[in-house]
C-alpha cells in the first residue's frame, strides 16, 4: 500500500485540527 502526499497531508490535517482547537481554547481560558 503506497502512501501518497495527499494522504499524508490529510492525516496531518486530521491530527492538527483538534490540537489547534484545544490550543485556542486553552488560550481563551487562560485570559
UniProtKB/Swiss-Prot annotation:
Keywords for the protein's UniProt record, in alphabetical order:
Chloroplast, Membrane, Photosynthesis, Photosystem I, Plastid, Thylakoid, Transmembrane, Transmembrane helix
A GO term from the CC aspect:
photosystem I
Query: Membrane topology per the record?
Result: Single-pass membrane protein
Where does this polypeptide localize?
Plastid, Chloroplast thylakoid membrane
**By its UniProt entry, which Pfam families does this protein fall under?**
PsaM
What processes does the entry annotate via GO biological process terms?
Answer: photosynthesis
> Which residues are listed as membrane-spanning?
7-26
Major localization class: plastid
Top-level taxon of the source organism: Eukaryota
For this chain, the family text in UniProt reads:
Belongs to the PsaM family.
Q: What's this protein's name?
A: Photosystem I reaction center subunit XII
**Gene that this sequence comes from:** psaM
Amino acid at each position: 500500500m503506497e502512501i501518497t502526499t495527499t494522504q499524508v497531508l490529510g492525516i496531518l490535517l486530521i491530527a492538527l485540527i483538534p490540537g489547534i482547537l484545544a490550543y485556542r481554547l486553552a488560550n481563551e481560558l487562560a485570559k
